[in-house]
C-alpha cells in the first residue's frame, strides 16, 4: 500500500520569489475594534495584512493613525499597502509612492476602481498602471476580474501574481462565475492566483483552493462577522483544508453512480442478481 505522509503535501506559497507560510491574506478595515483586529490576525497568522493608506491615516494624521501603525508592526506580519479608493492612474501612482515611503516596502496591491457602484476594477487602464509601478520597482499584486485576456495582459507587463475577484467587493457571494475562474486557473497554471474579493464563507475559500487557486484575501467576511476572531480561525482552517484537498487529487466527478463496494467477495445471491441484471 502506498501512503504519502501529510508533510510531503505541504508546498511553499511563493510570490515574487518570497516564500510565505500561509495562503491567507487579511484586510484590516471595518473591524469592531483594534483589539478584535489584533486577535483575528494572531489567530489566523496570515501571510500579509493589507492596509489602505488613504483610509487608515497611517501617515500620522493624529494619534489614531500612529497607534494603528504601531499595532501592525508589533504583530510581526508583513504589510501589503493597497491603493483602495483610487479612481485615476495618477492617484494610484501617488498613493503607491507614499505607501512605499510610509511602510518601507516595495509591495503594493494595485486597486484602480472603474465604477464606484460595483467597485469593478478599471480593466482598460489597469495594465498600463501596473507597468508604470513595476518600472518604479514595485512588486505589484493587481486586483482584477477573472477575464483571461486581461490577466494575460497583466502578466505581459510584468506582474508575477494576480488577484482576480470571485464576486464584487463586500458581497460575500462566493464565486459567481465558476466556469471562468476554473478556465483562468487551467490556462495560467504557473501563475500565483489569489482570490481577492467576494468571498463570504469559509466554504467559499475552500472551494477556490480546491480548484487550484493559490490563496485568498479576505476583509469584510471576517471583519463583519458576528464573531470576527472565530471567523478568522475558520477561514485559516478552510484555506489549509482546500489546499490539502487540491494536492491530494480529488476524485473526478461522474454523471452516473458507481458503487464504491466491488462485486468480488459479495454474497453469491447478490452476485447472482447482478449477473441477471447485466
Swiss-Prot record:
CDD domains (alphabetical): ThiG
Keywords noted in UniProt: Cytoplasm, Schiff base, Thiamine biosynthesis, Transferase
InterPro entries according to UniProt: Aldolase_TIM (IPR013785), Thiazole_synthase_ThiG (IPR033983), ThiG (IPR008867)
GO annotation, cellular component aspect: cytoplasm
Pathway involvement of the protein, from the record: Cofactor biosynthesis; thiamine diphosphate biosynthesis
Entry's localization field: Cytoplasm
Reaction catalysis annotation: [ThiS sulfur-carrier protein]-C-terminal-Gly-aminoethanethioate + 2-iminoacetate + 1-deoxy-D-xylulose 5-phosphate = [ThiS sulfur-carrier protein]-C-terminal Gly-Gly + 2-[(2R,5Z)-2-carboxy-4-methylthiazol-5(2H)-ylidene]ethyl phosphate + 2 H2O + H(+)
Sequence positions that bind 1-deoxy-D-xylulose 5-phosphate: 170, 197-198, 219-220
Superkingdom field: Bacteria
Assigned EC number: 2.8.1.10
Active site: 109 (schiff-base intermediate with dxp)
Pfam family, one: ThiG
Keyword Transferase recorded: yes
Keyword Cytoplasm: yes
GO molecular function, one term: thiazole synthase activity
Purpose of the protein: Catalyzes the rearrangement of 1-deoxy-D-xylulose 5-phosphate (DXP) to produce the thiazole phosphate moiety of thiamine. Sulfur is provided by the thiocarboxylate moiety of the carrier protein ThiS. In vitro, sulfur can be provided by H(2)S.
Family statement: Belongs to the ThiG family.
Name of the protein: Thiazole synthase
Protein's organism: Cupriavidus pinatubonensis (strain JMP 134 / LMG 1197)
Gene (name only): thiG
